[in-house]
Amino acid sequence: MQKREVFGFRKSKVAKTLCGAVLGAALIAIADQQVLADEVTETNSTANVAVTTTGNPATNLPEAQGEATEAASQSQAQAGSKDGALPVEVSADDLNKAVTDAKAAGVNVVQDQTSDKGTATTAAENAQKQAEIKSDYAKQAEEIKKTTEAYKKEVEAHQAETDKINAENKAAEDKYQEDLKAHQAEVEKINTANATAKAEYEAKLAQYQKDLAAVQKANEDSQLDYQNKLSAYQAELARVQKANAEAKEAYEKAVKENTAKNAALQAENEAIKQRNETAKANYDAAMKQYEADLAAIKKAKEDNDADYQAKLAAYQAELARVQKANADAKAAYEKAVEENTAKNTAIQAENEAIKQRNETAKATYEAAVKQYEADLAAVKQANATNEADYQAKLAAYQTELARVQKANADAKATYEKAVEDNKAKNAALQAENEEIKQRNAAAKTDYEAKLAKYEADLAKYKKDFAAYTAALAEAESKKKQDGYLSEPRSQSLNFKSEPNAIRTIDSSVHQYGQQELDALVKSWGISPTNPDRKKSTAYSYFNAINSNNTYAKLVLEKDKPVDVTYTGLKNSSFNGKKISKVVYTYTLKETGFNDGTKMTMFASSDPTVTAWYNDYFTSTNINVKVKFYDEEGQLMNLTGGLVNFSSLNRGNGSGAIDKDAIESVRNFNGRYIPISGSSIKIHENNSAYADSSNAEKSRGARWDTSEWDTTSSPNNWYGAIVGEITQSEISFNMASSKSGNIWFAFNSNINAIGVPTKPVAPTAPTQPMYETEKPLEPAPVVPTYENEPTPPVKTPDQPEPSKPEEPTYETEKPLEPAPVAPTYENEPTPPVKIPDQPEPSKPEEPTYETEKPLEPAPVAPTYENEPTPPVKTPDQPEPSKPEEPTYDPLPTPPLAPTPKQLPTPPVVPTVHFHYSSLLAQPQINKEIKNEDGVDIDRTLVAKQSIVKFELKTEALTAGRPKTTSFVLVDPLPTGYKFDLDATKAASTGFDTTYDEASHTVTFKATDETLATYNADLTKPVETLHPTVVGRVLNDGATYTNNFTLTVNDAYGIKSNVVRVTTPGKPNDPDNPNNNYIKPTKVNKNKEGLNIDGKEVLAGSTNYYELTWDLDQYKGDKSSKEAIQNGFYYVDDYPEEALDVRPDLVKVADEKGNQVSGVSVQQYDSLEAAPKKVQDLLKKANITVKGAFQLFSADNPEEFYKQYVSTGTSLVITDPMTVKSEFGKTGGKYENKAYQIDFGNGYATEVVVNNVPKITPKKDVTVSLDPTSENLDGQTVQLYQTFNYRLIGGLIPQNHSEELEDYSFVDDYDQAGDQYTGNYKTFSSLNLTMKDGSVIKAGTDLTSQTTAETDATNGIVTVRFKEDFLQKISLDSPFQAETYLQMRRIAIGTFENTYVNTVNKVAYASNTVRTTTPIPRTPDKPTPIPTPKPKDPDKPETPKEPKVPSPKVEDPSAPIPVSVGKELTTLPKTGTNDATYMPYLGLAALVGFLGLGLAKRKED
């Protein structure tokens, strides 16, 4: 800070921080203070805060707004406060001229004490007071002018008489002076002439003597020098002449030899040049001919190569064709010969075998017929006896079987119930054990963390304790030195600053408003207009405090205690134990003001700043009791803690009232510890104060107040004493006399030097007691079931002997004819390449001879010059000696005259004048705007919006002092991204700096701006205002801000607080609509039921419902630039599982009204999207996995007006169909969406569904028993009746859609199988219906199906009725199986696959394969008539298809065998009862409905 201007007023409590600024300019809103009665400490803060998140799934910028910086918190807590003021100079030109004229006229002018006009806080008040001062100045000037004029007349008369006498005296004096002047001139003339002559003579004599000595010395030196030079010259001359002669002789010899050598070399070089020219001419001619020949040969070679390559390509193509044709013909012929030979060999062998078989068959047949007739009669008798015995055993078996099955079922039911009960109990125990594990783990983790912290704290404690012990020892050794405690102590109390404390005062205590208290005090006679100077001055002191609205304004009544409670303390502790509350009890004990019953007091919002009170230049004594409480609300005993009683002034009172003001602490119930060298002493009643003035050296003080009474002074201990607490309740009186205003701060900031803080030993954590897990219940014992009785085994009937049939004799086959040999093509003749011409030989360039260089000419020698002979300098002549002159005598001087006495002058009058002092406090205002310049205070704007803070100051008043500095400091809110370049551009006229550590921007007016402000100080001047530019970055954040203006380091003021909020803040008291921005995504079926997490069948449609969450934007005032970032909704759908249905997309508002102006675009990937879309998603930090849809507002501004700013959320219905092929693999698919507002992304939850894999199965059985043998891959006899078992795919429980279709489609091979028209359909598992009823597994569901048969193509389709399927609960699984009865009608191997359709999606089963061999004695089949189709609800008993045995009475009747031939008739589908169900079957299906399966039908 610069040194502030001092205007000559006392250092009051209000003005201490200004080092003597004008009375009343008080710093009221104080930040971090020490426990001085009236000082302020500057505090630095940083913006480094822990990063946390908002809890909202924001895709970009998810961090929550950090805690406000300390600087910002303190600044806003002191909003509106003022520190100091600017002096206003009212023109006193007329008064000054009158004073100057009076002084010039000789009037005695006395300047009286300046009149204090107080502080103007408004422009109107300022103007009024300036007018009053001008009027006062004019009145004074007029009175001074009158006195001056009268005095001037008296002076004129006196001057006339004086002038007359002075003239006479002057005439006599002039004559004397004239004579004296002539005398002095003559004396001076003579003296000058004599002195000149003497000086000239002495100078000439001195110069003569000097010149004579110099000449004599020079002549001697010259003679010696000449002799030396002459000797040297003669020696050098002889040496040079000899050297030059030798050099000349050597040079002439070398020139002669060089000339001879160069003549021989030049002749030889001329011959070499001629030979080289001839060789080059020959080489150039040969090279030219070579190049021509080479070009011709290369052209011929290129033409020959091209022609050969063309012929070669044609030859190779033709050769390849001929070779392939011949090879194909040869291979075909050789194969035909081989096959023909093999066939004929086989036919010949077979024909030979046929002959042998025919002969053998005839002989065997004749013998068998005879034996058959004898065996038949015996078999029939044995079979009748066996049947009667079997029926009796069967009845007994069935009775016993029923009993055993019931007993076992009862035992099983009891056991299963016990198992379920046991599972339930153990599940509960396991859940409880899991919680115990988690609690134990949490306890362990917490203990380990506390233990680690304890160990770290212990190490720090030991280190701190060692430093503390050393500091205490040092304090002991220096206790008698100035500034140290006379009894060394350590500090265990930390009670220094609590700016965020919550102050409460009982409602029974009246808290005054500013104007209300002002009126009350004025009623007491304390008024600016009171002619009693003491009371008018007291008012200015009172008004300086009362104008600050951060204090609680109270009136204390004598002996009536008032409690002021502070809670929510954050920074205070005693011996490491946190202090959460402090209670001050104030009681007025006595006052010398008025009737002694009341006094004003002001309680600070910070308990460490404490309070101001008044004494109105009388005396006041207030008792203060202080109690501290811990976090449990228990009263704390702070015995041993130290408190600071400082800035206890004496002798610095108002010069206008009484300078001997005194501040003291009295009746302290603790113990004082004096500071060595301090002015504060202990007195009776345990009081402490200074015995004499500690304000001025001239009055005995060690220092002036300004040298010790500041927070930064190293001597501030001079006015302090330390109190040691000895009781739970601290009590003392704060007392004053003639002080006006008194600020008393109670805290632990000790002014003494070297008071260490005693470290607190950490407490070791207690190891937790872990819970023991509970044992599980033992499983119930499995019951022992009775074995079912063994069913009787019927002795098989003896088969009737087969009647032999006369064999059909085979016919021999003819041989195959031999194949014809092929005719082969001749291969083409290959082309012959013409040989290339050889290239000519290239001539070789000759090797040229090199001419020999000439010998260089010898260098001519450089001859040395002969030396110049020395010349002797002639001797100088000696000078002539001067003669001394003769001097003139001096004349006699004239006599001086006696002057007449002057008259007595008139008495000088005395006039008095005074100036008036006026202070001004210019007002400031902070405005907050968006990029469009719209005021957004107390409103909402979107995250990432540009927010501008305008720092405005009202016009500077006329009469102001020269503005030397004009500084605005703005501690920015956290989460506000400051743009330095934009701020500088918007803040012309200021030098802008930014401190990143404290997140503070400072504007200093430039020299040019200050020059504008100072151009005419007599007129008001409008100020420039800087603008802070930046962006708000956080969701759900509140950005509050104010700034501080400091002018000339003499006046400071903190502005109002502005506020703006971003959406996404739940429970926002300022914006009731504000809450998390949480778009949602829900999957629904077509009925609108939520199907998130459910099983979704392939082919089903997901009706995704996307909520565009906009309600928290209601009242938003974002700028046009922010709006142009647009509004979008992104659906990142799984394209591998779903197909979008853009034709079904709908957008509606919350009331269901359709919304226009929103478009949707689908992109296969991020890479396929336009660059603009890629940039949009990147900025919003959205990464899509593949294909995605982008919904966008066509006109962002209209969309903003209609939906965003009104807080109207939208609902997008976005249907998507599950791909059919996804059901064949099954699996999970996920879907996630994002909302993008103003460029900010917000994610929905992930919606997860699963598509079940439908795996139908096909078996071949001979009964309806599911456990019967599967004949897949085995043999089925010709004409055997069997079943194709079609097991449908499993539809899991908790599926999303009702079943509309569940069918079995079997495209059987009609060449080998014949459908009998009989089928049965059963439930494969328990089914739960919508009405709560249950259909048990194994229930016959045939009546709930319909069947269709396509006899021509061999297709049977069994469908469940839709009304039955829709009765099944969505929570129930579903699976069914159908048995199709078939009859094998042909020999061979037959494959079959069927298709299970679920909601129109087809799924192929496995393929079954059965083989029918040629029977040894096949029966002749009887064709089965085709029945008419029947309603399955009205079953009809069909005729049993018969497979007759050979008849005895017709032994010669042959039965033809059909090998792989289709029957000419096929029965139509019908429904049969269970009589013939063991023989149901279904033909194999391959390749139905485009499934790509290979169906083989043999004709």
UniProtKB/Swiss-Prot annotation:
Region (Disordered): 50-84, 689-709, 763-907, 1409-1472
Keyword Cell cycle attributed: no
Signal peptide: 1-37
Primary site of residence: secreted
Top-rank taxon, per record: Bacteria
Modified-residue entries (Pentaglycyl murein peptidoglycan amidated threonine), positions: T1469
Biased amino acid composition, Pro residues: 789-799, 828-838, 867-877, 888-907
Note: S.gordonii, a commensal oral cavity bacteria, is among the bacteria most frequently identified as being the primary etiological agents of subacute infective endocarditis (found in 13% of cases).
Official protein name in the record: Streptococcal surface protein B
Species for this entry: Streptococcus gordonii (strain Challis / ATCC 35105 / BCRC 15272 / CH1 / DL1 / V288)
Lineage, opening ranks: Bacteria, Bacillati, Bacillota, Bacilli, Lactobacillales
